[in-house]
Amino acid sequence: MNKMKNFKRRLSLSVPRPETIEESLTEFTEQFNQLHTQRNEDGRDEPGQLSPGVQYQQRQNQRRFSMEDLNKRLSLPMDIRLPQEFLQKLQLENPGLPKPLTRMSRRASLSDIGFGKLETYVKLDKLGEGTYATVFKGRSKLTENLVALKEIRLEHEEGAPCTAIREVSLLKDLKHANIVTLHDLIHTDRSLTLVFEYLDSDLKQYLDHCGNLMNMHNVKIFMFQLLRGLAYCHRRKILHRDLKPQNLLINERGELKLADFGLARAKSVPTKTYSNEVVTLWYRPPDVLLGSTEYSTPIDMWGVGCILYEMATGKPLFPGSTVKEELHLIFRLLGTPTEESWPGVTSISEFRAYNFPRYLPQPLLSHAPRLDTEGINLLTSLLLYESKSRMSAEAALSHPYFQSLGERVHQLDDTASIFSLKEIQLQKDPGYRGLAFQHPGRGKSRRQSIF
């Protein structure tokens, strides 16, 4: 239990003894009443002095505003169904705006609604299982929406896995349309459950269902969304470190979202030393393969290039089974690196030890003929040996390859979906096998979280 308290403290989730819901509601309603009294003492119009029609309209406006204000103050999803008794206690008909709730009041209120409780969610199907965690498809009793429940087993000797700590600590602060939303966090003595928004598929499954033959327009839309989410992370000094098609989730609308931040890191300076045992082998850059532990955001950009190629061709770019084979595949396509293409490479002991043949670079167009000239240029800019020379996610968003998407895609708010623009729609994939990713009606965004 002490370990769990320490874990919560690290995530800024622990507080002194929280106020009871009655105490927090009293505080909330007192703020309403004080403001109401102050308004009358200041000589402003009271409801009795207004005509019935004006009184009714005023009450309706105040009630609507109060409900919206409550959602904002508690950071609730827009489709939340608050218990009726909870709404009655808040006395939403009172006019005026209270000052913001304290952190303790907010958390007590959230707990009263049902957040942070296992009984709020119903497990439906088991989606997968790993060393530390099992993922279930579930349903929220609060919203009736589907959710993904990532149940992490807590070993009493070790406490919460560091990957879980990283994932929660990073995701609770990331609010972007192309990053999976963490809705809730539930802890017990035996497990830590992360409640995520549910998405129907991932990029690997999408490729499988379209026969590994994607419409090139869809490739562009998915690529832009990947870069949007990644640029948002990189601006906040966060490296994902495990980009691969399986970690790019896709819903029926076609929205692509970065997921699985278990290996992600918040970096303070570009040269900070990290483990080189990160990133699935096929998407691992050559500098990391050769043992480099000093890297920054370019570690993710090599993987982006590999994913672009895979979407365009339907097959992985460098499917090596060992580090040596992976390097061999890279060098055979891009040419064995030299001091000109990769300054300092000859001083890397691992590179000298492998003693690779001297391959000449091959034209990428011959391997990815469906990519146009701009697409090949973007791919080339991502697959550079010298990490600092790779194009950044922010710069890639402005690459001419995306010009056909229009200018408005660059003006969206972080939480706005690219599909909120009527000109952005997926097209039918040539190899379509029956998995529908149709564009549904545009409703309000549900990307809201309690964090």
Curated annotation (Swiss-Prot):
A Gene Ontology BP annotation from the UniProt entry: regulation of cell cycle phase transition
Catalytic reaction list: L-seryl-[protein] + ATP = O-phospho-L-seryl-[protein] + ADP + H(+); L-threonyl-[protein] + ATP = O-phospho-L-threonyl-[protein] + ADP + H(+)
EC category: transferase
GO molecular function, one term: cyclin-dependent protein serine/threonine kinase activity
Chain residue ranges for the region called Disordered: 39-61
EC numbers: 2.7.11.22
Stored SUPFAM superfamilies: Protein kinase-like (PK-like) (SSF56112)
Active site residues according to the UniProt entry: 242 (proton acceptor)
Gene Ontology annotations for the cellular component aspect, listed alphabetically: cytoplasm; nucleus
Binding-site residues, ATP: 127-135, 150
Pfam families given in the database record: Pkinase
Function: May play a role in signal transduction cascades in terminally differentiated cells.
Recorded family membership: Belongs to the protein kinase superfamily. CMGC Ser/Thr protein kinase family. CDC2/CDKX subfamily.
Name assigned to this protein: Cyclin-dependent kinase 18
Organism: Rattus norvegicus (Rat)
Underlying gene: Cdk18
